[in-house]
From Swiss-Prot:
Pathway: Amino-acid biosynthesis; L-arginine biosynthesis; N(2)-acetyl-L-ornithine from L-glutamate: step 1/4. One of its GO terms (cellular component) is cytoplasm. Its EC number is 2.3.1.1. Residues 296-434 form the N-acetyltransferase domain. This is Amino-acid acetyltransferase. Homohexamer. Keywords: Acyltransferase, Amino-acid biosynthesis, Arginine biosynthesis, Cytoplasm, Transferase. Gene3D superfamilies: 3.40.630.30, Acetylglutamate kinase-like (3.40.1160.10). GO terms for biological process: L-arginine biosynthetic process. It catalyses: L-glutamate + acetyl-CoA = N-acetyl-L-glutamate + CoA + H(+). GO terms for molecular function: L-glutamate N-acetyltransferase activity. Belongs to the acetyltransferase family. ArgA subfamily. It comes from Escherichia fergusonii (strain ATCC 35469 / DSM 13698 / CCUG 18766 / IAM 14443 / JCM 21226 / LMG 7866 / NBRC 102419 / NCTC 12128 / CDC 0568-73).
Amino acid sequence: MVKERSTELVQGFRHSVPYINTHRGKTFVIMLGGEAIEHENFSSIVNDIGLLHSLGIRLVVVYGARPQIDANLAAHQHEPLYHKNIRVTDAKTLELVKQAAGTLQLDITARLSMSLNNTPLQGAHINVVSGNFIIAQPLGVDDGVDYCHSGRIRRIDEEAIHRQLDSGAIVLLGPVAVSVTGESFNLTSEEIATQLAIKLKAEKMIGFCSSQGVTNDDGDIVSELFPNEAQARVEAQETAGDYNSGTVRFLRGAVKACRSGVRRCHLISYQEDGALLQELFSRDGIGTQIVMESAEQIRRATINDIGGILELIRPLEQQGILVRRSREQLEMEIDKFTIIQRDNTTIACAALYPFPEEKIGEMACVAVHPDYRSSARGEVLLERIAAQAKQIGLSKLFVLTTRSIHWFQERGFTPVDIDLLPESKKLMYNYQRRSKVLMADLG
């Protein structure tokens, strides 16, 4: 019997290896809302968390219990009370909160302990540690309303948490914390996860909600948001009356975490099997990232980028779309190239060849990775090349193209005669290739 080979599996593994190396030894804070815990996909999420641990990632898991607490209150016919969208935790509510949180802690610990069963890592031991790593204090009284046992973080024993992470344990923390006087307080999982990510200097904070991240007006996933954009989303949702959805709660924390030094905060769906792995081990992820600095950068190319440029343009050269360039030619002309990189992969490039005497520049070798051609990378490159041309005193920009005529025309270029090319370029014109000449004023 001949075994079938899966090239998709091979390609996926090759693409994931750089991320495995990057993530190893880093600290991730994972926030699991009560909605995620009660979903049928939760066992898969726990298995994926166990897999992350086996890859050497330091994990702090924070769980919430909102729906479980509400169900407990309803079962005991105890009406929940809120003030300014914050739960008021009276003595009776506190007992039910502790009951729900305690049950979840035992359940999650048990699931994590067996998460690697039925895998090649079966028998590997996962140590899950919980404790009084967080000291709480009361929220107090606001507008005459006593929040009772609703609290906030007073301090975090980050050194003790680091010791547990150094020993290879997963740290598991829930919504109940104690004060210096021995009282118990009900805290939000968002505050706990956010403050832990900040204090532990975590590389990432990861949250789960019902949808696959934040969407735009067309319903498409927004892959990246800066903190000010995420804050605007929160304010818009609050204006619409949404104060406590999983997305809004996470975004509030993500904005604060990013502004306090956490590099990336990820929002993904608890309903999608494997979403955690797809988000962390693929170039584009599957959800929404909140970042201070984009995973994508546009910059001038250096000699170290030649390999990436060649890998990008070779298929287009083989199809006859681009004129062939040797490695030696690229090495000599690398200072003319601008590239767009995403997670150290070159996904687009273009070059500017100036003709100073005629005050004209050529935009050449324009290439965009097939996975990104439906996005605006071409426009981004055009804007950058045009800006570079104006900066050095050029007044016009031209292109020679056989396939992208309409694309350039839609962006202000018009067909012109070959005679309008700079003299040196005119002498090099390939009449067999018969490229169209298009030109635009830079203004």
